[in-house]
């Protein structure tokens, strides 16, 4: 499996056993100025959701793209 690890659509081959791509977003102290923090990566299972954190998981190559800004 390959998953996006950066915002420039650069994908990375996931380690063996990690077949899930994820996009994790959350707010920190600068959320109102900079927007949500974002983490892209691979996992063996979809990470557990914690309060204030959004996680989207998918299982096809490079399916975890993240688009900044609002659609026009």
UniProtKB/Swiss-Prot annotation:
It is found in: Secreted. Disulfide bonds join 3-21, 14-42, 27-31, 46-57, 58-63. Its main location: secreted. Transmembrane segments: none annotated. It comes from the Eukaryota. CDD domains: TFP_snake_toxin. Amidation does not significantly affect toxin selectivity, since the activity profile and binding data are reminiscent of classical long-chain 3-finger toxins with a free carboxyl termini. InterPro entries: Snake_3FTx, Snake_toxin-like_sf, Snake_toxin_con_site, Toxin_cobra-type. GO terms for molecular function: acetylcholine receptor inhibitor activity; ion channel regulator activity; toxin activity. Binds with high affinity to muscular (IC(50)=114 nM) and neuronal (alpha-7/CHRNA7) (IC(50)=58 nM) nicotinic acetylcholine receptor (nAChR) and inhibits acetylcholine from binding to the receptor, thereby impairing neuromuscular and neuronal transmission. Competitive radioligand binding assays also demonstrate that this toxin competes with epibatidine binding to the Lymnaea stagnalis acetylcholine-binding protein (Ls-AChBP) (IC(50)=4.9 nM). Belongs to the three-finger toxin family. Long-chain subfamily. Type II alpha-neurotoxin sub-subfamily. Monomer (predominant). Negative results: does not affect alpha-3/beta-2 (CHRNA3/CHRNB2) and alpha-3/beta-4 (CHRNA3/CHRNB4) nAChRs at 1 uM concentrations. This is Alpha-elapitoxin-Dpp2d.
């Amino acid at each position: 499996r390959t998953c996006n690890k950066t915002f420039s659509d650069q994908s990375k081959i996931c380690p063996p056993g990690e077949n899930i791509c994820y996009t994790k977003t959350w707010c920190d102290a600068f959320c109102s100025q900079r927007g949500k923090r974002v983490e892209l990566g691979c996992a063996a299972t979809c990470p557990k959701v914690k309060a204030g954190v959004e996680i989207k998981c998918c299982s096809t190559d490079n399916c975890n793209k993240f688009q900044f800004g609002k659609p026009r």
